[in-house]
Regions:
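Helix N-cap motif at beta-to-alpha junctions
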Residues: 46-52
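Extracellular S/T/G-rich loop segment that most often corresponds to the catalytic His/Ser-adjacent loop
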Residues: 183-184, 189, 322, 337-414, ...
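Short, surface-exposed ligand-recognition loops at beta-strand->loop->(often short) alpha-helix junctions
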Residues: 1-12
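Protease zymogen maturation seam
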Residues: 26-34, 38-40, 57-183, 438-484, ...
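C-terminal subdomain of the subtilisin-like protease fold in secreted/lumenal serine endopeptidases
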Residues: 34, 240, 244, 264-302, ...
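Subtilisin-like serine protease catalytic core
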Residues: 142-143, 160, 170-205, 212-264, ...
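Gly/Ser-rich catalytic serine loop of serine hydrolases
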Residues: 212-223, 329-333, 389-402
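Active-site-proximal beta-strand/loop segments in catalytic clefts of secreted hydrolases
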Residues: 3-4, 47, 66-69, 153, ...
């Protein structure tokens, strides 16, 4: 139940309606949980149907909704639609270690997998006399595909017959300063494996609203998402602080209550605590009313059909200066029919297939989508095999890529209210073939770009991909929209 304004709760409790209910049984004992952040007020209450009918008519009540359940997106279904690459096989025969095929082992030892160097000259050269300049270009060699695409205007090659062919050929170019050190990125998900070495000690426990007794990430979705935001090897923002806010259990299920509790935690943590009990957006005496000075971003790789209560809660966080990045959804429909993607001031992210530079066939679309990022077979961290990456597919993967980019922009001093505008200014336009947008009205033809244009000489002057029409037709034939589960009473990780 949500209420109309910060004073509505007491007025509601003092109303004649509640007094009549109190004669039957004390209503306060039926209130399970209350929410209060900014001007948003709400609570979870256990009431019989006859009381709910009366309460809905109260002038102090905005809306009453069931504490409906939500679940993790079926990753296996998504992969069955698009997967044409490598597989992971966990054998573990005779008690031995699992054998994983097709991926390079990342032992978190730095240069064995992650190559990092800076290239600078002239005014961009960092100084050694204490006067460090704000921009110089660093290079991550043998970078994962999604990072290479983020720092490139043109298409990357892909060989459908040999997916590993170009695996070690790409670079990720980024500015060395402003890598998110002053920013908190809140991951509302299934938990995060915060002690994974690729987070370099920058991942912190925030809150657990599942309270199952199982700490960390027992599902894997949250760790994969967090890795795309800010891990050393797969993350966009190399120094951002990852805050684990667990709202899903080991099978990827939760309730509206857990999500709302997570949003309330972020509001309080960003406004009053920040990293290690101090504000992360300035001096220790920074005030929570200083909206434009905050450096907090939320990643929500989840959604539901359009819901006013969720939208109102998200809108309140945005008013507080918190940037909210959400997934468009995986149902191949108009994202404006969903929440929180339909909130005007969130950053809604769709997925594109960077193998063919086209909107991913599962991605939601429409004018509520702000930008697209790679979302097909995206490589990131695993919660089960900490020294091997895994590939996952969905707008859940595209969203944290943009969240990482938002962290870079916040760290560079761009105000929260200007982040979406800056993302669109940097973006690469007119990538998707126009014919693919004919039946997706209002969809932006725009993909995320980090602003560092450094083309790989070996590939820049070629057109990709070099594939046969038979291969595309075979993949299209396997597409079955009915495999995507939809429910008006479910929030779904995407």
């Amino acid at each position: 139940m949500s209420l109309k304004g910060p004073k509505a709760f007491q007025r509601f409790m003092d109303s004649q309606l509640v007094q009549e209910i109190l004669e039957s049984k004390p209503i306060r004992k039926r209130i399970i949980k209350t929410y209060s952040f900014g001007n948003f007020r709400g609570f979870v209450i256990d009431l019989p149907n006859e009381w709910l009918i009366k309460i809905r008519r109260s002038p102090f009540v905005s809306q009453v909704v069931p504490n409906f359940s939500f679940k993790a997106f079926d990753e296996e279904t998504a992969l069955s639609e698009v997967y044409r690459g490598r597989t992971i096989v966990a054998r573990g025969e005779n008690g031995g270690s699992p054998e994983l095929h097709g991926f390079k082992k990342d032992e978190c030892r730095g240069d064995s997998v992650y190559f990092d160097k800076f290239e600078a000259s002239g005014k961009d050269m960092p100084q050694v006399n204490g006067k460090l300049l704000s921009r110089y270009i660093k290079t991550q060699s043998e970078a994962p595909r999604h990072l290479a695409r983020l720092s490139r205007r043109s298409q990357l090659p892909y060989d459908f017959n040999d997916p590993t062919r170009y695996e070690s050929d790409f670079n990720y170019y980024y500015y060395g300063w402003h890598q998110g050190r002053s920013v908190n990125a809140y991951v509302l998900d299934s938990g995060v494996m915060i002690d994974h070495c690729d987070f370099e000690g920058r991942a912190y426990y925030g809150a657990d609203f599942i309270r199952s007794g199982n700490s960390g990430d027992q599902n894997g979705h949250g760790t994969h998402v967090a890795g795309l935001i800010g891990s050393k090897t797969y993350g966009v923002s190399k120094k951002v602080n990852i805050i684990d806010v667990k709202v899903l259990d080991s099978v990827g299920s939760g309730t509206l209550d857990t999500v709302m509790s997570g949003l309330e935690f972020v509001s309080n943590h960003c406004n009053y605590k920040g990293k290690q009990g101090k504000p992360v957006w300035g001096s220790e005496d920074s005030h929570d009313d200083d909206v434009e000075s905050k450096r907090c971003v939320i990643n929500l790789s989840l959604g539901t059909f359009r819901s006013t209560i969720i939208n109102e809660a998200i809108e309140e966080l945005i008013k507080q200066g918190i940037v909210v990045v959400v997934a468009a959804g995986n149902s191949n429909m108009n994202a404006c029919w969903t929440s929180p993607a339909s909130v005007a001031d969130v950053i809604t992210v769709g997925a594109f297939d960077d193998r063919i530079d086209s909107i991913a066939k599962f991605s939601n679309w429409g004018n509520c989508v702000d930008i697209f990022a790679p979302g097909v077979l995206v490589k990131s961290l695993s919660n089960k095999f900490p020294y091997y990456p895994i590939e996952q597919t969905g707008t859940s993967m595209a969203t944290p890529i943009v969240t990482g980019l938002v962290a870079l922009l916040l760290d560079s001093g761009i105000k929260p209210t200007q982040i979406k505008k800056r993302l669109n200014e940097l973006a690469t336009d007119n990538i998707f073939p126009r014919r693919t947008l004919l039946f997706k009205p209002g969809t932006p033809n725009r993909i995320a770009f980090n602003g560092v244009k450094r083309d790989d000489d070996d590939y820049h002057h070629y057109s990709y991909p070099n594939i046969t029409i038979e291969h595309i037709l075979k993949e299209l034939d396997s597409y079955n929209p009915s495999n995507y589960k939809r429910s008006t009473l479910s929030l779904t990780l995407v």
